[in-house]
Structure formats: structure tokens, C-alpha cells
Amino acid sequence: MTDNNEFDVADLRREYIRGGLRRSDLTENPLELFERWLKQACDARLPDPTAMCVATVDANGQPYQRIVLLKHYDDQGLVFYTNLGSRKAQQLAQNPHISLLFPWHMLDRQVIFLGTTERLSTLEVLKYFSSRPKDSQIGAWVSQQSSRISARGVLESKFLELKQKFQQGEVPLPSFWGGFRVKFDSVEFWQGGEHRLHDRFIYQRNADTWKIDRLAP
């Protein structure tokens, strides 16, 4: 470990000066504000603006997190894809509750979605899978996600084997690969503010409308 006299994480701090978030800035529907912020993150050329931290819980109440890419969103929910044998997919099969966090650090912003998941239909999954680059399709066949392997070479050898196998024609959709739709009922927007007086607003679904409240930082 580094000597604390040389490096102390408590000394790492900065002021948040990119502006605030006011009630007048909000939209009636949280997805409209999310889309605005996402487009601004893309315009600012943030790396991986669609990257989100996906949190799930196992049967013992132990939370797990990982970064996953958002692939679609609309009023029905937010969509991502994964190996159905993965840890997150197995946990969601037991407990569909989920949290998504978009960490747009360079804009001093974050957005948190809370909700439950539902599996996508085979037709929806096939439509997206068919749009992926061929090497990515083959990669989906290679990895038994979250399983233990002896070395990276195991994956690379399997990839080359399958690349040869699928050299001609289309790569079929693996039966163990699918997607989830997050049906959200709570969305929180956070904007960094001066003197640690950050702006937070939470949307909570109320039948066909959204209740909006400001939260203390």
C-alpha cells in the first residue's frame, strides 16, 4: 500500500461549477429529460455515454454491479442484452428488481432508474442480434458468461474455431442469449452544485402521471 503521507484519497476533491438544475428545467415525463441529457452526453463526446451500472441482488441479499450498454429506450422501458446464463440474468430470474445508474462524470450528472425487468421476446432479441457485427455475434457463442476459465487462450481458441465454422452464411442466435426490458417506476436526476449543494429531483410513477419532488443533496 502507498504511504498515506504520499497519497490520501480524502484530499481528492473539486468544486462542481457546471450549473444547476431547476424545477423549470424539468419535463413532465422523465424519459424526455433523460433523452435530452443523453444527447448532451453524446454531443460532449463522453466515452461510452450509454454505459450504465446495472445493480442486481442474489438470493442472499448480496448486491452485484456491472457496467452494461443501453441498447434501446422508449416509454415501455430501457433495454439491454446479455447471456442468459450470466450472474445478472440468473439473479433477475429470482428477483426482477433492478437499479440502473448512468454516471456522466464530465457533465457532473447522474441518472438513476429503479424498476423491474421482463424478458424480451425471441423476435425482439433476434432483430437486435442480427444487427450486430459478425464477430460480436460469434463472441456471444464463445463466452459462457460468469463461468470460471483457465486462461484467455481458451476463449481465443474457441473464437477462431467458431469463426471458421460460421465463415459462410449467418450466425444463428444462441438459445442462451437474450435481453431484458427495465420497466421503471422511479427516476432520479442529479446535477452537481457549488458548495456540495447538489440538485436532485426524483420522478415517481403515479398511475398515468409522474410525481416530481426535489430531494436534499
Swiss-Prot record:
<comment type="function">
    <text>Catalyzes the oxidation of either pyridoxine 5'-phosphate (PNP) or pyridoxamine 5'-phosphate (PMP) into pyridoxal 5'-phosphate (PLP).</text>
</comment>
<keyword id="KW-0560">Oxidoreductase</keyword>
<feature type="binding site">
    <location>
        <position position="110"/>
    </location>
    <ligand>
        <name>FMN</name>
    </ligand>
</feature>
<dbReference type="InterPro" id="IPR019740">
    <property type="entry name" value="Pyridox_Oxase_CS"/>
</dbReference>
<dbReference type="GO" id="GO:0010181">
    <property type="term" value="F:FMN binding"/>
</dbReference>
<feature type="binding site">
    <location>
        <position position="71"/>
    </location>
    <ligand>
        <name>substrate</name>
    </ligand>
</feature>
<protein>
    <recommendedName>
        <fullName>Pyridoxine/pyridoxamine 5'-phosphate oxidase</fullName>
        <ecNumber>1.4.3.5</ecNumber>
    </recommendedName>
</protein>
<keyword id="KW-0288">FMN</keyword>
<comment type="pathway">
    <text>Cofactor metabolism; pyridoxal 5'-phosphate salvage; pyridoxal 5'-phosphate from pyridoxamine 5'-phosphate: step 1/1.</text>
</comment>
<dbReference type="Pfam" id="PF01243">
    <property type="entry name" value="PNPOx_N"/>
</dbReference>
<dbReference type="InterPro" id="IPR011576">
    <property type="entry name" value="Pyridox_Oxase_N"/>
</dbReference>
<keyword id="KW-0664">Pyridoxine biosynthesis</keyword>
<feature type="binding site">
    <location>
        <position position="128"/>
    </location>
    <ligand>
        <name>substrate</name>
    </ligand>
</feature>
<dbReference type="GO" id="GO:0004733">
    <property type="term" value="F:pyridoxamine phosphate oxidase activity"/>
</dbReference>
<feature type="binding site">
    <location>
        <position position="88"/>
    </location>
    <ligand>
        <name>FMN</name>
    </ligand>
</feature>
<dbReference type="InterPro" id="IPR000659">
    <property type="entry name" value="Pyridox_Oxase"/>
</dbReference>
<feature type="binding site">
    <location>
        <begin position="81"/>
        <end position="82"/>
    </location>
    <ligand>
        <name>FMN</name>
    </ligand>
</feature>
<dbReference type="Pfam" id="PF10590">
    <property type="entry name" value="PNP_phzG_C"/>
</dbReference>
<comment type="similarity">
    <text>Belongs to the pyridoxamine 5'-phosphate oxidase family.</text>
</comment>
<feature type="binding site">
    <location>
        <position position="136"/>
    </location>
    <ligand>
        <name>substrate</name>
    </ligand>
</feature>
<dbReference type="InterPro" id="IPR019576">
    <property type="entry name" value="Pyridoxamine_oxidase_dimer_C"/>
</dbReference>
<dbReference type="InterPro" id="IPR012349">
    <property type="entry name" value="Split_barrel_FMN-bd"/>
</dbReference>
<feature type="binding site">
    <location>
        <position position="132"/>
    </location>
    <ligand>
        <name>substrate</name>
    </ligand>
</feature>
<keyword id="KW-0285">Flavoprotein</keyword>
<feature type="binding site">
    <location>
        <position position="190"/>
    </location>
    <ligand>
        <name>FMN</name>
    </ligand>
</feature>
<feature type="binding site">
    <location>
        <begin position="13"/>
        <end position="16"/>
    </location>
    <ligand>
        <name>substrate</name>
    </ligand>
</feature>
<comment type="subunit">
    <text>Homodimer.</text>
</comment>
<comment type="pathway">
    <text>Cofactor metabolism; pyridoxal 5'-phosphate salvage; pyridoxal 5'-phosphate from pyridoxine 5'-phosphate: step 1/1.</text>
</comment>
<feature type="binding site">
    <location>
        <position position="200"/>
    </location>
    <ligand>
        <name>FMN</name>
    </ligand>
</feature>
<feature type="binding site">
    <location>
        <position position="87"/>
    </location>
    <ligand>
        <name>FMN</name>
    </ligand>
</feature>
<feature type="binding site">
    <location>
        <begin position="196"/>
        <end position="198"/>
    </location>
    <ligand>
        <name>substrate</name>
    </ligand>
</feature>
<feature type="binding site">
    <location>
        <begin position="66"/>
        <end position="71"/>
    </location>
    <ligand>
        <name>FMN</name>
    </ligand>
</feature>
<dbReference type="GO" id="GO:0008615">
    <property type="term" value="P:pyridoxine biosynthetic process"/>
</dbReference>
<feature type="binding site">
    <location>
        <begin position="145"/>
        <end position="146"/>
    </location>
    <ligand>
        <name>FMN</name>
    </ligand>
</feature>
